[in-house]
Amino acid sequence: MSQILNDNEIKEFNKNGAIHLKGKFDIKWIEKLKVGINKAKINPSPRFTNHTKDEKLPSYLEDFWTWNLHEEFTDFVYNSPTAKIASELLEAKRINLVMDNWFFREAGSKSKPPFHHDISYFDFEGSMCVLWIPLEPVKKQDGIAWVKGSHLWNKLFLRTR
C-alpha cells in the first residue's frame, strides 16, 4: 500500500501534536460511519452517555468500544485508511486499536467537554494517535481545538465533569 501522508504532514504532526488532514477518507467511509452512528444511537452499548446539559437544546451523545457492535464500524476499523494514517503519523510499523469512540454533537449544542489530553483516559505509556473525523461540515467554533505543541509540555490535562 502506498503512503497516504507526505513528509511535511508528518513533520507538522510531530511539531504541533495535531494536524488538519483533508481528503484522506473517501466519502463512502463518511457515509458508512453516519449509518453506524444512527444505528448506535438506536441500539447503544451499556457505555453510552448522554452529555446534553439542557434537554431543550441540541444533544451531545457519546459511546465507546462499539467497533465490533455495528458492521459499519467493524468495516471501518479493518478496511479504511485509519490504521495506515495513524502508523504514518506515529512512524510506527504496528498500530493497536486501544479504543474507538464516537461523539454526536448536534449543531447549536451548548454541551461540550473541557480541555483535556486524551491520553489521560488510558493506562499505558507511549505514543498515541487520535483521529477526529467529522461526518459533516463543522464551523470552527463547533469543532475540536488543540493547543499546538502541548504534547511536548510534559504536563497532563485531565478531563473533569
PLM features: what roles do these ranges have?
Residues 1-16, 21-115, 121-122:
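Non-heme Fe(II)-dependent double-stranded beta-helix
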